[in-house]
């Protein structure tokens, strides 16, 4: 009888959950009968020799690796800060925040039952499941948020940044994941929801940055995510600073074209 590779990892106690198994597999350290395998859905015989070589993922999901890159490249420090993880899902970003010194994290998601058990039981985490960030008011959050990560799907960041801004303290920071497939017009999205055109990637980056600037977010940095989205989409990390003095910004992202080129060179191999 054959099983999916991610299921095999969980059954053999090589991963705590299917989500974590997928992350470990995608990190390129899983071998089946001596051959490296990086697709969680690949089917193998139950008797196959499955090995995890090297260090397993240090976060509850691969999302943590995205925020880790942003923190490293953007010089973000979270020690002692009150944070929010919008689109928390399993909690990879939340986990990364806590491991980097956050004292409190509001984990917000429209779904429910997804946040990893270890995070649910962490007194520093406020689990806000079944919650749409668009309708959260400052009165519901007793703290002013100092750092926000945003990783949402099936909605444009232009619908989310405004509500997030209302919850933040002056000079607070945001790292948002720009997903071209949810920002571009339908006519620009290819088969299986994948956007491959560099020009479209650049267009959506500039659109999101421009919108953010129009509501008082200053764009500080841009990088590409180290991991593709589930369908193979290249995604981008945009670093913003919250300004509350009425300023607006054009947010011409310097070097965006070069970052898009580098993303394709690195991830489309």
Give the ranges of each region predicted by the language model.
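A short glycine-rich, Lys/Arg-flanked "PGG" loop and its adjoining helix->strand segment in the class I
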Residues: 158-175
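Short, glycine-/aromatic-enriched active-site segment of Class I SAM-dependent methyltransferases
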Residues: 180-196
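Conserved class I S-adenosyl-L-methionine
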Residues: 79-89
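S-adenosyl-L-methionine
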Residues: 106-159
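Glycine-rich helix-loop-beta junction characteristic of Rossmann-like nucleotide cofactor-binding loops
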Residues: 14, 72-79, 139-142
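Conserved SAM-binding loop of SAM-dependent methyltransferases across substrates and taxa
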Residues: 90-101
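Flexible, glycine-/basic-rich loop-and-beta segments that form/coincide
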Residues: 234-269
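A basic, amphipathic helix-loop patch mediating RNA/tRNA/ribosome contacts
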Residues: 1-48, 82-83
């Amino acid at each position: 009888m054959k099983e999916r590779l991610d299921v095999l990892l969980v059954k053999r106690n090589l991963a705590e959950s299917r989500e974590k198994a997928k992350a470990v597999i995608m990190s390129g350290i899983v071998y089946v009968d001596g051959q490296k395998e990086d697709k969680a859905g690949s089917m193998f015989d139950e008797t196959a020799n499955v090995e995890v070589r090297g260090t397993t993922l240090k976060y509850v999901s691969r999302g943590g690796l995205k925020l880790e890159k942003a923190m490293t490249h953007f010089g973000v420090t979270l020690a002692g800060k009150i944070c929010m993880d919008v689109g928390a899902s399993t909690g990879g970003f939340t986990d990364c925040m806590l491991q980097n010194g956050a004292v409190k994290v509001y984990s917000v998601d429209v779904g429910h039952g997804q946040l990893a058990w270890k995070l649910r039981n962490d007194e520093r985490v406020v689990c806000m499941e079944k919650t749409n960030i668009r309708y959260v008011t400052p009165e519901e959050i007793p703290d002013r948020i100092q750092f926000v990560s945003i990783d949402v799907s099936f909605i444009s960041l232009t619908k989310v940044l405004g509500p997030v801004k209302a919850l933040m303290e002056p000079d607070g920071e945001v790292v948002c994941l720009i997903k071209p497939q949810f920002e571009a017009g339908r006519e620009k999205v290819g088969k299986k929801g994948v956007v491959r055109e560099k020009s479209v990637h650049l267009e959506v980056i500039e659109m999101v940055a421009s919108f953010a600037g129009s509501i008082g977010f200053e764009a500080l940095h841009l990088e590409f995510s180290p991991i593709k989205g589930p369908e193979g989409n290249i995604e981008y990390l945009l670093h913003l600073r919250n300004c509350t003095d009425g300023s607006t910004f054009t947010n011409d992202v310097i070097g965006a074209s070069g970052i898009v080129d580098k993303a394709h060179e690195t991830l489309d191999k």
